[in-house]
From Swiss-Prot:
This is 1,3,6,8-tetrahydroxynaphthalene synthase. One of its GO terms (biological process) is polyketide biosynthetic process. The keyword Transferase applies. Keywords: Acyltransferase, Melanin biosynthesis, Transferase. The active site is at residue 164. Pathway: Pigment biosynthesis; melanin biosynthesis. Homodimer. It is an enzyme of class 2 (transferase). Belongs to the thiolase-like superfamily. Chalcone/stilbene synthases family. It comes from the Bacteria. Its EC number is 2.3.1.233. The gene is rppA.
Length: 377
């Protein structure tokens, strides 16, 4: 039976004291669960590992240590025990580790989310799986569907290439699907094992990535209308919007070659964020009768200190607005597409926004692009 959306949930008081309908239908987040590998290390330990793997013997390690100190990261989780990274001789070995470890983490994340939502794997109608740190055919989602006992008719959408924007974009695509299939249950699964993509060279981009990125997985269960949300502390998804910025392909992504995935990360990313993000986000909110001051909760992908600072500047956010993102960056690093989902889980379970609070979930990724998701608790 279709569960109707409560219209009052999607009506907001304007800043002028009037009331108006922001949007007439939505979908609901039923649960989010993050899974992290058990191998957790201090940033200082990872500094020495990366120096050993990436720098020439006897090379000055001062720049690397400065990068790691300024990254805003205290600890990270790795897919493998730290001593095993020296033995990863080629892309084939790294990708095999991605498949083995990634599948186990995916099952842990999805099982946790389903349990929290009171559902089973057989209840899933749509499974969207995003990862940019490994490849497989059959895809990871196909293997997981069989392993967890999903129905034979489950719809599967494996996604590669979204990178850090994948958590926000994936949640947006669940929303789009559920608007047309309001009786269904849809799942987003993010699996990112960034440490397995580390190259054995001292290029600046490789060292920057080695200072920021960690490993982990996250799963989101979503349903049509407000089914499963009441009393659980999870928000409604009211609307989404993406922005693709022309002539920015060079800013972020991979160069793929014989050694695997070589990171591309340009110093111009914060400038693009400061130039475009504020106006684009304000236009998105205005479409739904809102302004930034109406937003009580900001859930931002923790891309790094410079990116978070640029987001705060672009949106003119008050001090503390991005505390959950900074906390996630410090605790686990940048988990690529899984990061913003971990922040969403933290906000919902630790911060517990009051009913009626508006939120914005946002992330940026290769393209260069941004994705906005409007939430209501």
């Amino acid at each position: 039976m279709r569960v109707p959306v409560a219209v009052d949930d999607l009506v907001a008081p304007s800043t002028m004291g009037e009331r108006h309908t922001v949007i007439d239908r939505g979908t609901s987040v039923a649960a989010v669960h993050t899974a992290l590998p058990p191998h957790r290390y201090a940033q200082s330990d990872l500094t020495e590992l990366i120096a050993d793997l990436c720098l020439e013997p006897g090379a000055d390690r001062a720049l690397l240590r400065r990068l790691h100190t300024s990254a805003g990261v205290r600890t990270r989780h790795l897919a493998l025990p730290i001593e095993q990274y020296a033995g990863l001789g080629d892309f084939g070995q790294a990708n095999a580790a991605w498949l083995t470890v990634g599948l186990a983490l995916a099952e842990e994340a999805l099982s946790g989310a389903l349990d929290a939502a009171g559902l089973t794997a057989a209840d899933i109608d749509l499974l969207v799986c995003t990862s940019i740190t490994g490849v497989a055919a059959p895809s990871l989602d196909a293997r997981l569907a069989v392993r967890m006992g999903m129905r034979a008719d489950v719809k599967r959408v494996p996604v590669f290439g979204l990178g850090c924007v994948g958590g926000a974009a994936g949640l947006g695509r669940l929303h789009d699907y559920l608007l047309g299939h309001p009786d269904d249950t849809a799942v987003l699964l993010s699996v990112e094992l960034c440490s397995l993509t580390l190259q054995r060279d001292g290029s600046l981009a490789n060292l920057v990535a080695g200072a920021l990125f960690g490993d982990g997985a996250a799963a989101v269960v979503a349903r049509g209308g407000d089914a499963g949300r009441r009393g659980a502390g999870w928000p409604m998804v009211a609307a989404t919007r993406g922005h693709l910025y022309p002539d920015t392909e060079h800013l972020l992504g991979w160069r793929i070659g014989a050694s695997g995935f070589r990171v591309v990360v340009d110093a111009g990313i914060p400038d693009v964020v400061r130039t475009h993000l504020g106006g684009d986000l304000r236009n998105f909110l205005a479409t739904h009768g809102l302004v930034p001051d109406d937003i009580g909760t900001w859930i931002c992908h923790p891309g790094g200190p410079k990116v978070l600072a640029a987001v705060g500047d672009a949106l003119e956010l008050p001090d503390g607005a991005l505390d959950s993102s900074w906390r996630s960056l410090a605790g686990v690093g940048n988990l690529s597409s899984a990061s913003v989902l971990r922040v969403l889980e933290d906000v919902a379970t630790r911060c517990r926004p009051d009913p009626g609070t508006w939120g914005v979930l946002l992330a940026m990724g290769p393209g260069f692009c941004a994705e906005f998701v409007l939430l209501r608790w």
